Regions:
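Short alpha-helical segments that sit at the start of domains
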Residues: 1-14
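Short amphipathic alpha-helical interface segments
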Residues: 13-22
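A short alpha-helical element within helix-turn-helix/winged-helix DNA-binding domains
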Residues: 26-36
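Short coil turns linking two alpha-helices in DNA-binding domains
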Residues: 38-41
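Basic amphipathic alpha-helical segments that dock to polyanions
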Residues: 46-50
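Beta-hairpin "wing" of winged helix-turn-helix
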Residues: 52-61, 65-67
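Non-DNA-binding regulatory cores of transcription-related proteins
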Residues: 68-140
């Protein structure tokens, strides 16, 4: 995953659904009003969250609801849902693909960076797994 806003917008989306779903139809337009994002982007994120089994969406203006309880959804679940690339990679850190193999730096850059970046990715995922949507709802 490239460093972008998908994760934070997805978390915002889920918090909106959890906060408002009892009293409102939480549509992509509704969520867009809270996030300040285009409804098309919200629908894309909702599609990924639905594919991951985190939310349910109803066609048209039916709105969205959570598929699980808020204490069963971690930030890692959300991260996995929205950050995975088409090739299955969800790493925050991606290598540039064509370093110069004849250069003493370029020929070893992947090897040199693999361990520390893998450790950082693991730490990120461990931290995200410690926080649930319920934890965040308590702070709203």
């Amino acid at each position: 995953m490239k460093l972008n806003t998908n994760l934070t917008v997805a978390i915002h989306t889920i918090l909106c659904i959890a906060f408002f779903e009892k009293d409102n139809k939480v549509t992509s337009d509704f969520i867009a009003g809270s996030t300040g994002m285009n409804p098309v982007i919200i629908r894309r994120i909702l599609g990924k969250l639905q594919a991951a089994g985190i939310v349910e969406t109803k066609a048209g203006v039916g709105g969205s609801s959570l598929s699980k309880k808020t204490d069963e959804i971690t930030l890692l679940d959300i991260y996995k849902a929205v950050s995975e690339e088409e090739d299955g990679d969800r790493s925050v850190f991606n290598f540039h693909s064509n370093p110069n193999p004849k250069c003493p730096v370029g020929s070893k850059i992947h090897l040199v960076l693999e361990e520390p970046l893998s450790a950082a990715q693991k730490s990120l995922e461990e931290e995200l797994n410690k926080t649930t949507v319920s934890d965040l709802m308590e702070k709203l």
